[in-house]
Design a protein with these regions (language model features):
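C-di-GMP signaling machinery
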Residues: 47, 62-108, 118, 150-157, ...
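Structural preference for long, well-ordered alpha-helical segments in enzyme cores
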Residues: 16, 20, 24, 56-63, ...
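PAS and PAS-like sensory/regulatory domains
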Residues: 35-40, 107, 125, 182-184, ...
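Catalytic core of bacterial c-di-GMP phosphodiesterases, primarily the EAL and HD-GYP domains
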Residues: 119-123, 154-232, 307
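Active-site core of bacterial EAL-family cyclic-dinucleotide phosphodiesterase domains
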Residues: 88-150, 187, 248, 305, ...
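Surface-exposed amphipathic alpha-helices with a cationic face
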Residues: 21, 25, 172-176, 206-207, ...
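Cyclic-dinucleotide signaling modules
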Residues: 1-90
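EAL-family c-di-GMP phosphodiesterase catalytic domain
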Residues: 4, 134-137, 189-196, 215-230, ...
Length: 350
């Protein structure tokens, strides 16, 4: 329902909402109905934000949608900045859909080296999804923080994830010409597990490129499987059965704990980059970081420290006997061609 109200402020709209609520309540009581209801209200100053009926309708629908997203009896006053964010999300989703149906044009895989902490030699890489969309100014890179949640919301992460997985497997095969035991880490989303058949996708990629199963490592953040235990356990058992490595990403954030490591039995855990940075700049965090390492090692799980940016940090990680390292000190994520040029030799990365 749309109400055209002459009002001097949003408070007038709130007052109207209360009147409507009271009227409905009194009617229900008087007629002896049994009903539970709530009223969500979106408010827009049409004189300020609308130039025509169609624009007003679209912006009002947005305001009402925002109000409903706040829960029962939600109330939202139109904000132009929020609306611009909403429109940008719509543009990104449209671009993602278009890319998927056009042979993944706009998607690209970047690779960041993972090195052995003691020898400083490259032993693998993490495959990272990147996306750019066409705008009036040309190609515009979209932050993974923006487009990956949208891929998950729309289900497009299933075909896009399959594409990235195959590209990463092909790159692993290429790198093994130079580094025989090279391993590739690929991120998997909870949506791929719940709605797709990612186990089959992984096995198909391994078979297609004749990879040893242990050379393909599946990464997931703990938040990705906290709320889907049955589905995740089935997925985890499938990985174990087929000899595919499993890695817990971003350890040290959110719900991450040692019980998780014990129950999930990963090949190794990746210490979150922010956790690493704090440990390098705070004695208290350093002691915590240092004491976690032997506990994790005691249950036969290795550790990769993310976010290594300085030589001093590298030396501290050596002292703490961390197994693997990843970070800008060894190399920023880059495309396939650049990665091959820089790291195919297999020598020390620095």
């Amino acid at each position: 329902m749309i109400v055209d109200l002459e009002a001097s402020s949003a408070e007038d709209a709130v007052a109207l909402k209360e009147k409507i609520t009271d009227k409905l309540h009194n009617f229900i009581v008087a007629e002896n109905y049994e009903a539970i209801f709530s009223i969500s209200i979106g408010v827009i100053d049409a004189a300020t934000f609308c130039e025509g009926t169609e624009e007003c309708r679209k912006k009002f629908e947005f305001a009402l949608k925002q109000a409903k997203s706040m829960g029962k009896n939600g109330f939202y006053v139109f904000d132009q900045d929020d609306y611009e964010v909403f429109l940008q999300k719509g543009r990104i989703v449209a671009a993602l859909r278009n890319a998927v149906v056009n042979h993944y044009d706009g998607f690209e895989v970047y690779y960041q080296p993972i090195v052995d902490c003691q020898t400083e030699q490259i032993i693998g890489a993490e495959a990272l999804m990147r996306f750019s969309m066409i705008t009036e100014e040309g190609r515009e890179f979209v932050s993974p923080m923006e487009f990956i949640p949208l891929l998950e919301e729309t289900g497009l992460i299933i075909p896009a994830g399959r594409y990235i997985l195959n590209e990463a497997a092909a790159m692993c095969c290429e790198m093994q010409k130079y580094i025989p035991d090279f391993r590739m880490n690929v991120n998997v989303s909870y949506v791929q597990i719940l709605q797709g058949n990612v186990e089959r996708d992984i096995l198909d990629a391994i078979q297609k490129y004749a990879l040893k199963p242990e050379c393909l490592c599946v990464e997931m953040t703990e938040s990705g499987f906290m709320d889907m235990t049955p589905s995740f356990c089935k997925f985890r058992k499938s990985l174990e059965k087929n000899g595919i490595s499993f890695v817990i990403d971003d350890f040290g954030t959110g719900y991450s704990n040692l019980h998780c490591i014990r129950d999930m039995n990963p090949s190794y855990v990746k210490m979150d980059r922010d956790f690493t940075a704090k440990a390098m700049n705070s004695d208290r965090d350093y002691e915590l970081y240092k004491n976690i390492i032997p506990m994790v090692h005691s249950i036969n799980v290795r550790i990769c420290a993310e976010g290594i940016e300085e030589k001093e940090w590298l030396l501290k990680m050596k002292e703490m006997k961390v197994d693997y390292l990843q970070g800008y000190y060894f190399g920023r994520p880059c495309g396939k061609k650049q990665f091959l040029q820089q790291y195919a030799s297999g020598i020390n990365v620095k």
